[in-house]
């Protein structure tokens, strides 16, 4: 079996390395493709080591036809509008991030149009934005595949295309899916992380099947992305397999390596991404001061040890340690299967974090995990759907403190208990390993991929589709020929005009969406503005 694994960027290789190795061990040919060399600083060496043992092709092209900018504008706008769904309306940071990308993520000649569309959308109520998002979804369905992607897949002729992470700016992967569907190649989307279906935008093009971590993600696909539940399989989170199997470094050895006193209690601070906690160093300083001035002698003597988020590792240097009051900063070239992260948590009596997947790893080890709700973190916590999944009140491992003083009180109880956690075995099984807490997930991924290749093959009329592909590939070759360039572009422009006209018709005939209380602007006013925007230049 020949499998093409579209990773989007090299950095995303790390969550599926064991799955790829498992497929190759069963004799399957696996080629990984990436459109970017991006790798987080602390995962760079791990990724390079994986590359040495796997076949990785860097495909650097993006959509090449006259619809390239229009399709990007359409997808950026739809991501922005998608956050008007009832469950996502508190996700203000994610919505504003999408708006900023809409205004700044296009070629210069399109930025004025993008800014205009952004202002129009920002002035609409939630219901109106959702209606516009639905019109964009119809436009997406009518967007033809790009010949360059079709040719890329036609030459390789895989039995299956697997894509990840797909959502959040990996728009080239959607064009890869379009090309695969045109050729009759089955497509599986492997969900990358715990937050991908709520913080990274909408699923613009439906794959044939999706592999998810748990029942929560299956519901998210149905409720937020309108994806049919019968095309979803729950497998678990393979990225934690090695972490479940790890053993700790001896305490004296670990402490000696970082200048820590093994006799003192340790507290692990698990760093968040800067998008979640922009000024995390200031909070760490406040926490450190609160611990040192605590009336509890064990807390006052405790060493606060930071394990930075992979994306912020370069922000922490010697001066940062001194200014933040940390006892040590522990960073390593690993991202997954991180022995240092395991040791930091294992040798601590508790872990503290704002909103990070490392809190999940603390639960795997069995340490108490705490967060604190402060005004500066409100949007990153209350405004994040996935954050609620980890809270103790919802069956998760994380206990919430209402203030810094409350956090210190909870830490005092934890140190008195010797770091024993109340335990969250149900969370670990339902959220990470739904097929059994003792069952590694990567082999399940391999089994399901093998099963789906067989199950999905009859759904495709491969012969008919590939006959059409030959015609499209010929068009691509003709495009490069100077004498046919004008004809190709003219046809593309006609297709684009037809697409805009269709979208304008949909908008014109759409019923007025629900209005929010207090709004006086009529729906017809903004429908007309958007209609003019879509048909401008036709």
Show which residues each predicted segment covers:
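A short, glycine/small-residue-rich beta-strand->loop->alpha-helix junction that serves as a flexible
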Residues: 5-17, 166-170, 276-278
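Active-site-proximal region of nucleotide-activated glycan assembly enzymes
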Residues: 52-57, 136-147, 160, 164-171, ...
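Donor nucleotide-activated moiety binding/catalytic core segment of transferases
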Residues: 153-154, 311-360, 365
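Catalytic binding pocket for nucleotide-activated donors in carbohydrate/polymer assembly enzymes
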Residues: 204-207, 227-229, 234, 355-434
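Conserved catalytic-core segment of nucleotide-activated headgroup transferases in glycan assembly
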Residues: 240-324, 328-331, 437, 462-465
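C-terminal amphipathic helix plus adjacent low-complexity
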Residues: 271-275, 394-538
């Amino acid at each position: 079996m020949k499998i093409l694994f579209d990773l989007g960027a090299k950095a995303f290789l790390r969550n599926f390395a064991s799955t790829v190795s498992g497929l190759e061990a069963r004799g399957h040919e696996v080629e990984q493709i990436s459109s970017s060399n991006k790798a987080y600083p602390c995962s760079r060496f791990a990724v390079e080591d994986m590359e040495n043992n796997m076949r990785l092709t860097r495909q650097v092209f993006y959509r090449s036809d006259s619809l390239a900018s229009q399709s990007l504008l359409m997808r950026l706008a739809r991501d922005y509008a998608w956050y008007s769904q009832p469950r996502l309306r508190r996700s203000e940071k994610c919505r504003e991030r999408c708006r900023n990308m809409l205004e700044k993520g296009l070629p210069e000649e399109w930025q004025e149009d993008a800014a205009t569309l952004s202002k129009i959308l920002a002035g609409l109520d939630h219901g109106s934005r959702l209606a516009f998002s639905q019109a964009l979804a119809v436009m997406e369905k009518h967007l033809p595949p790009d010949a360059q992607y079709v040719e890329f897949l036609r030459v390789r002729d895989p039995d299956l295309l697997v894509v990840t992470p797909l959502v959040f700016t990996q728009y080239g992967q959607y064009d890869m899916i379009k090309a695969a569907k045109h050729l009759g190649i089955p497509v599986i989307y492997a969900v990358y992380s715990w937050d991908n279906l709520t913080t990274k935008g909408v699923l613009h093009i439906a794959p044939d099947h999706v592999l998810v971590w748990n029942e929560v993600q299956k519901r998210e696909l149905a409720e937020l992305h309108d994806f049919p539940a019968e095309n979803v399989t729950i497998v678990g989170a393979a990225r934690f397999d090695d972490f479940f199997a790890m053993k700790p470094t001896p305490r004296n050895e670990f402490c000696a390596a970082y200048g820590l006193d093994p006799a003192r209690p340790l507290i692990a601070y698990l760093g968040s991404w800067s998008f979640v906690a922009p000024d995390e160093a200031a909070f760490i300083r406040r926490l450190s001061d609160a611990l040192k001035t605590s009336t509890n002698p064990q807390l006052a003597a405790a060493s606060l040890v930071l394990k930075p988020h992979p994306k912020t590792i370069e922000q922490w240097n010697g001066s940062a340690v001194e200014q933040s009051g940390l006892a040590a900063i522990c960073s390593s070239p690993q991202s997954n299967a991180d022995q240092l992260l395991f040791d930091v948590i294992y040798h601590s009596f508790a872990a503290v974090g704002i909103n990070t997947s490392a809190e999940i790893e603390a639960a795997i080890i069995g340490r108490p995990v705490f967060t604190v709700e402060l005004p500066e973190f409100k949007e990153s916590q209350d405004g994040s759907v996935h954050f609620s999944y980890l809270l103790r009140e919802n069956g998760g491992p994380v206990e919430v403190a209402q203030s810094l003083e409350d956090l210190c009180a909870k830490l005092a109880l934890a140190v008195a208990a010797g770091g024993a956690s109340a335990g969250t075995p149900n969370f670990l099984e339902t959220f990470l390993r739904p097929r059994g807490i003792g069952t590694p997930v990567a082999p399940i991924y391999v089994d399901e991929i093998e099963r789906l290749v067989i199950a999905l093959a009859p759904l495709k009329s491969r012969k008919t589709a590939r006959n059409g592909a030959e015609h499209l590939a010929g068009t691509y070759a003709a495009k490069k020929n100077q004498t046919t360039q004008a004809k190709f572009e003219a046809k593309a422009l006609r297709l684009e005009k037809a697409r805009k006209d269709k979208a304008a018709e949909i908008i014109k005939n759409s019923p007025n969406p629900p209005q929010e209380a207090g709004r006086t602007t009529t729906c017809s006013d903004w429908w007309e503005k958007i209609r003019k925007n879509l048909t401008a230049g036709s």
